[in-house]
């Protein structure tokens, strides 16, 4: 009797394992399809205000994606999940806004032939039925009418370049407990948003600092983050002329760069870099909204802003001999 009772318990423990079989459907081509949204647009002056929302042109066609569910799938209905890595900053009219950068939030509305209109991110949305779901054959993911909205969170000058990134990864499953492991398609975006408010820096010319020849051993002697002995900082005054920006407006200038280590712009020689500072020698941290030089335009919407620069050791090591350069960008913003 004890032995029979033990076998019965073993069978009962086994049944849930068979029921826990996960149905994760995949793209019929084996890799996720990218559905790309070009955000490039031109705002007018009234659009470039905090809180303003701009609806971009609708992508009205079907996304053109087919999914396949694994063999052994029971039932012919599916669920769809739209997952993002971005934080939701707020909602309005159903739209859930995600932070795209320091100036803009983005949100999307999608229409499905069965589920109707919904606003991602959302998980396990009940979709319709298709006979191919249980047959291990392709079936259409019937998303269409993708509508993208942009909300201004900070006024900007000239333009904002939005690098390519994935906004949503879209998963197809058959239950609300299936893991979200393999996306069927992704929704990505990039673009450039231009505004009428513009400022020309240094009459459109490159601001260049040339420090001549510096002994390689001086960098290793200086140590990480320090200027080589005997090398002086250089100062320049940058002219700024703005258009469609109100006279006497308070603006700021800051530094943007691609290769950065703390407050240092790393050069094409990884052991060497440059520090950009305000006229008092306080370093500016690249790509940091709060590290800036405030200034006020005059009655003709112009200004003069002083900056300083000097070379530093990035690693504390002796750099390879040869010419080294670094590139950064001066960006003017509303204060």
How would you describe each model-predicted region?
Residues 1, 13-14, 141:
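Intrinsic-disorder-associated interaction segments
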Residues 1-8:
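Bacterial N-terminal signal peptides that target proteins for export
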Residues 15-19:
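N-terminal signal peptide c-region/cleavage motif recognized by signal peptidases
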Residues 21-335:
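Mature extracellular/passenger domains of Gram-negative fimbrial/pilin and adhesin proteins
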């Amino acid at each position: 009797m004890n032995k029979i009772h033990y076998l019965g318990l073993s069978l009962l423990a086994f049944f849930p394992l068979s029921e826990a079989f996960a149905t994760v459907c995949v793209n019929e081509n084996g890799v996720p399809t990218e559905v790309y949204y070009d955000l490039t647009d031109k705002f007018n002056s009234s659009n470039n205000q905090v809180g303003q929302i701009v609806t971009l042109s609708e992508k009205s066609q079907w996304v053109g994606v087919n999914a396949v569910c694994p063999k052994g799938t029971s039932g012919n209905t599916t669920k769809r999940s739209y997952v993002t890595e971005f934080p939701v900053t707020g909602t309005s009219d159903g739209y859930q806004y995600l932070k795209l950068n320091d100036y803009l939030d983005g949100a999307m509305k999608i229409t499905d032939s069965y589920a109707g209109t919904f606003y991602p991110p959302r998980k396990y949305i009940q979709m319709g039925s298709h006979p191919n779901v249980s047959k291990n054959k392709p079936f259409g993911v019937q998303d269409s009418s993708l509508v993208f909205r942009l909300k201004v969170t900070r006024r900007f000058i000239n333009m904002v370049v939005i690098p390519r990134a994935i906004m949503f990864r879209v998963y197809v499953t058959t239950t609300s407990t299936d893991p979200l492991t393999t996306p069927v398609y992704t929704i990505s975006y990039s673009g450039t948003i231009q505004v009428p408010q513009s400022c020309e820096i240094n009459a459109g010319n490159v601001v260049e600092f040339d420090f001549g020849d510096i002994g390689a051993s001086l960098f290793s002697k200086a140590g990480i983050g320090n200027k080589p002995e005997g090398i002086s900082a250089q100062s320049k005054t940058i002219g700024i002329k703005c258009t469609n920006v109100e006279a006497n407006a308070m603006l700021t200038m800051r530094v943007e760069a691609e290769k950065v280590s703390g407050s240092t712009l790393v050069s094409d020689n990884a052991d060497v870099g440059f520090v950009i500072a305000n006229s008092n020698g306080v370093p500016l941290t690249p790509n940091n909204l709060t590290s800036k030089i405030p200034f006020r335009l005059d009655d003709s919407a112009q200004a003069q802003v002083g900056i300083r620069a000097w070379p530093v050791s990035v690693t504390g090591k002796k750099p390879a001999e040869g010419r080294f350069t670094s590139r950064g960008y001066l960006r003017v913003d509303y204060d």
